[in-house]
């Protein structure tokens, strides 16, 4: 809930200027060109994974007003990628949920949803 922005370099700007795009979820694509990114395919320099961002949105939309840490983990599980034997980096390597009231976070590696480590700063 609340206001959110993705700040990223514009891949089409020769000066690589920063852009701040209002979004509540994003995966491996440039949010500033989200309307040009198609799901379930590579989109050149613009990236991929729009279907996973949609999976996150579906979970968050289903829990409007009650988005706690459990909902955040549910959204991350919905968007997780299984390993691709032909591309070792094409899978969910880590997932993190940040605490928006305390300087803390919880993280898991490689979709080990039952093995979550919490950190406080």
Question: Locations of the language-model features?
Answer:
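C-terminal, well-structured catalytic/ligand-binding subdomain of enzymes
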Residues: 2-121
